[in-house]
Curated annotation (Swiss-Prot):
InterPro entries: AAA+_ATPase (IPR003593), DNA_recomb/repair_RecA (IPR013765), DNA_recomb/repair_RecA_CS (IPR020584), P-loop_NTPase (IPR027417), RecA-like_C (IPR049261), RecA-like_N (IPR049428), RecA_ATP-bd (IPR020588), RecA_C_sf (IPR023400). Signal peptide: none annotated. It is found in: Cytoplasm. One of its GO terms (molecular function) is ATP-dependent DNA damage sensor activity. Its main location: cytoplasm. CDD domains: RecA. Can catalyze the hydrolysis of ATP in the presence of single-stranded DNA, the ATP-dependent uptake of single-stranded DNA by duplex DNA, and the ATP-dependent hybridization of homologous single-stranded DNAs. It interacts with LexA causing its activation and leading to its autocatalytic cleavage. This is Protein RecA. NCBIfam families: tigrfam_recA (TIGR02012). The keyword 4Fe-4S does not apply. GO terms for cellular component: cytosol. The gene is recA. SMART domains: AAA (SM00382).
Amino acid sequence: MSDRKQALEMALRQIEKQFGKGSIMRLGENTDQQVSVIPSGSIALDVALGAGGYPRGRVIEVYGPESSGKTTVALHAIAEVQKRGGQAAFVDAEHALDPKYAKNLGVNIDELLLSQPDTGEQALEIAEALVRSGAVDILVVDSVAALVPKAEIEGEMGDSHVGLQARLMSQALRKLSGATNKSKTIVIFINQIREKIGIMFGNPETTPGGRALKFYSSVRLEVRRAETLKQGQDMVGNRTKIKIVKNKIAPPFKTAEVDIMYGEGISREGELIDIGADLDIVQKSGAWYSFNEERLGQGRENAKQYMKENPAIAAEVEQQIRDHYGLNGEKTVTVEGEDDEVLSLLDDE
């Protein structure tokens, strides 16, 4: 072995001794990265995400207009983690979490860790401490817009605090990203939408908290209401579109459409009818839906109700859909060539 190679090997051993195994490696040793994913709680969203759920050890941003279903999407993820025996935490910066609604969605509120911090700094320090513990499987911060810097809270009404929140988020994400990857915690940041002033062309919408979150997020979901669902004159829920605007573990720009029912969350039966009909697992003839020559009902709402009343049929349809897409619980996917970033046009602001 030449002196140069010997010197390099000694340097590599010294680096690994000081900083731990894996702190430096040859590029060819780790071209494919194994990423464990956990189901999102929505079959349609799992399909759109490509990998079958949310990746562990990554930052995820869920944003959209008010009352579009952002918190509902996050709560379903918490319920899925808890079903698998995982520990979940919710940092409620908006002080608006409804325990009754969370319970209806399948969240075990007795086991859910809840923090309602006073300042943005406090919220992010709590989040960092939980992630670094390595004992939390999913952490939700609701919302970035409500992470008010201490200086703004203690200042006078009308004082200008330009860029404070963006700097706070940038610093927090620099500290959080490495710890998140090591602890394999799923960190979900819920965010709101703001309008940029004076934009004549292009999309005037942006998200608070600066650009850092856009760059550090492996997955960004845009949640929007498409239409209101009615039964007679009563409004019972929303048809909601979830667009994957950034995805570093699978191809982006796919869309999932779900029914979010008031007080119940994402309608499992609605997803089974829609995806089942697309795959011809559920047959549609005119307005009638049927499965294995058994009629489910006339019209989508009646078919949904029939599935709700017959859980065995719903379970059979769900299993066939899961088998088709390979969505059977928590799994590991291989991320190839995760070079830089797969950014949406929204990131080029």
